[in-house]
Amino acid sequence: MGDKPTLVTLLTVAVSSPPPSSPLPLVSFTELLLPPPSVAAAAVAATATSEVGEKTAEQEVAAADPETGNERRENRENEGGETRTTGTTAVKRSHDGIPRQLAERLRLCRHMDPEQDYRLPAQDVVTSWIEALRDADRDNYGRCVRHAKIHRSASHLTAYESYLVSITEQYNTASNVTEKASYVQGCIFLSFPVIYNNTQGCGYKYDWSNVVTPKAAYAELFFLLCSTSESSVVLQPLITKGGLCSSMAVYDEETMRQSQAVQIGFLHTQLVMVPFVPHACPHYAVPFTTPGKPGCGGAPSGVAGLEEAAPFGRVSVTRHGATLLCRVDHLTWISKRVTTYGHKKITRYLAQFRGTMDDDEAALPGEDEAWIASKNVQYEFMGLIFTVNVDSLCVDAEQRQLLGTVATSFCHRVSDKITARNMPRAFSFYLLTSAQRGYDLRFSRNPSLFFSGDALNCPLLNEPNVFSLTVHAPYDIHFGVQPRQTVELDLRYVQITDRCFLVANLPHEDAFYTGLSVWRGGEPLKVTLWTRTRSIVIPQGTPIATLYQITEGDGNVYSYNHHTVFRQMHAAGTTTFFLGDMQLPADNFLTSPHP
């Protein structure tokens, strides 16, 4: 038996060998990098041995690849190193404190650096690309034009009518469909059975139900699924693509009285699917605030989360045209906590900073300017991922200072194992600045800390989904006390056009229900949740709601009961559609009046 090949030998042979003539099964680089358990155990044993064992490993490397072996020996002779002994195990370390075995592995995979997620093309390349697109627009005159999503104000039912008829027919031809659907005046109507379970004999008003509906495939086409006024069981409204849907069902008082003696039975709900096409989310920015001046949307003046008693970090700001590069040092982190289910849980970490421009002659951002920050930066501690970014910024023109805060985002869970000492001491971000008037949507704080979605990163994505944003749980949500919880986020916005956000459910979520409501400018974001059982816990960072852009109308969905149904009102020769007390804007909900 010969000597077993080492990991370095395997990698050397794999790199130097020519490609085989026959295809081989795909193997990830991680599988190549991580040795099997037997090899890993041998590596640990080799680390615990004396210098003789380590020289033997060097000889194996030199035998497999003399250049690699010579390079390793030269590095050891030149760099030296130190030996740290813990108990009976001697660990060889280089000057930078990294164990040599780990340093060797990092050297082999040195091309797998974390900077790959943050690299961008040079500004002159982007500028030249945009100019080339403009030249192409002139050549394309009279043909198609480049899409400007903010210009689209309304959708038309005629663009989808034949497709709606088609998916209705597909639904009716399914073998498991007992109640046929019908397409009438732009909407799909269907009846669906709901199982009433009263085996305990006490009766209840709220239940949970699954329904199967026609399904749409267009990226921009959704449905408002809700019950009509003729239903004895009211399915609470959903925004869905169709297919299998789960929602909370509410029984009216008459149905509850009639079903007291029934243990398990069937009731029917009359459903309507209203075609829904949201507006594409516009480009956003965050205005610079000034001391003593109210922020965007009526937010408190100054910097969000700023605490005078806490120490400030130091920021150094360098201007590169319209871009500000900010380097923050000496950060001191403060934990924000909330009491949930009798326990205080960490919701996020926050640190504040202040500083001046590197160049005394460089101009500070003005009150009429707004900013867009670089993407969230990922950090890892004990295998737990969390992200950090700038939260809010304030410009003090008198002191020529820039004040601000950085914070962890709600898009990831902040574990109790992470403490303030584990948080980064230094941080860096850049700001793209421009005039506020160039942005239709302006948030009071960095929305990347609260939401996720392609609409926040459109310039860097191919074929992004610009029709929705996802809201994440800011803390662990417990339903042990009551099945209904309302989550409030201190984030506001101002929108110049007559648009607002529709807060809706997550697609295909059956563990909890998110109440449909309208989030208007100047108000904090509120998300109301119901759960099926009181033992459910929604961890921090879990998606809890979806945001859609709609044309602003009158009213809102104030209650979630048997009155939350689809209805229409006729007045002065016009027909208006409502969901509960909320008027459905005709620009987004594509309905035609009944004849």
Curated annotation (Swiss-Prot):
Q: Where is the composition biased (Basic and acidic residues)?
A: 69-82
Q: Major location, coarse class?
A: host cell
GO cellular component labels: host cell cytoplasm; host cell nucleus
Q: Name one GO biological process term.
A: symbiont-mediated suppression of host innate immune response
Sugar attachment sites: N176, N197
Q: Does the keyword Signal apply?
A: yes
Where it sits in the cell: the answer is: Host cytoplasm; Host nucleus
Q: Where is this region: Disordered?
A: 47-94
Pfam families per UniProt: DUF570
Extract the signal peptide range.
Answer: 1-23
Q: Which domain of life is it from?
A: Viruses
Which InterPro entries does UniProt cross-reference here?
A: Herpes_U10 (IPR007578)
Q: How does it assemble?
A: Interacts with host CGAS.
Question: Which protein family is named in the record?
Answer: Belongs to the herpesviridae U10 family.
Name recorded for this polypeptide? Protein UL31
